[in-house]
């Protein structure tokens, strides 16, 4: 069982289709989401990133997560398993993340052989056996939309 603890969206209005190179919108969304949830970044056990495996998105995410001090939190992306389902990706990946919480295991980021970003991130390379208490789902979209959602295990 799990409970939605907090969720928020921010828009950096950066570009019609490309994410902000600075990660500002995602940084603001996650910061506000953590504050709303009443927890600190180091309370997070797991991050399900938007993770498109594109240069601009992955770099932007690594910058935002670095600024937030989330470099060591286990992180994965489900897109290699289910594809980029566009508007449904946040919902689909939230469900998969909640299933991870329930089963006590976090899936590896399929096909991630090289971490090609400038900031340190802790990409899950093999199935990770943990019982997450808090999980962060992030998503970024066209027009500068950035969302963050924190789920708590009950």
Language-model regions, residue ranges each:
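Glycine-rich phosphate/pyrophosphate-binding loop at beta-loop-alpha junctions
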Residues: 11, 46, 61, 80, ...
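Condensing-enzyme catalytic core mediating Claisen C-C bond formation in acyl metabolism
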Residues: 1-37, 45-46
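Conserved beta-ketoacyl condensing-enzyme motif
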Residues: 41-57, 72
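Short glycine/threonine-rich loop-to-helix capping motif typified by GTGT followed
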Residues: 14-22, 52-69, 87-92, 126
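Short beta-strand scaffold segments in enzyme catalytic cores
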Residues: 146-150
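Glycine-rich beta-alpha junction loops
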Residues: 6-13, 51-53, 82, 140-141
């Amino acid at each position: 069982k799990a409970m939605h603890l907090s969720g928020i969206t921010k828009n950096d209005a950066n570009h019609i289709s490309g994410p902000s190179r600075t990660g500002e919108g995602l940084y603001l969304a996650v910061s506000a989401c953590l504050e709303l949830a009443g927890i600190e970044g180091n309370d997070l056990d797991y991050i399900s990133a938007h993770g498109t495996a594109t240069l601009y998105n992955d770099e932007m995410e690594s910058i935002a997560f670095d600024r937030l001090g989330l470099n060591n939190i286990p992180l994965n992306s489900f897109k290699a398993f289910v594809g980029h389902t566009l508007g449904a990706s946040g919902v689909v990946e939230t469900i998969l993340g909640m299933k991870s919480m329930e089963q006590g295991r976090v899936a590896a980021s399929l096909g991630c052989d090289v971490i090609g970003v400038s900031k340190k991130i802790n990409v899950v390379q093999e199935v990770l056996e943990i019982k997450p208490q808090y999980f962060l789902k992030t998503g970024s979209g066209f027009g500068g939309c950035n969302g963050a959602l924190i789920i708590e295990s009950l």
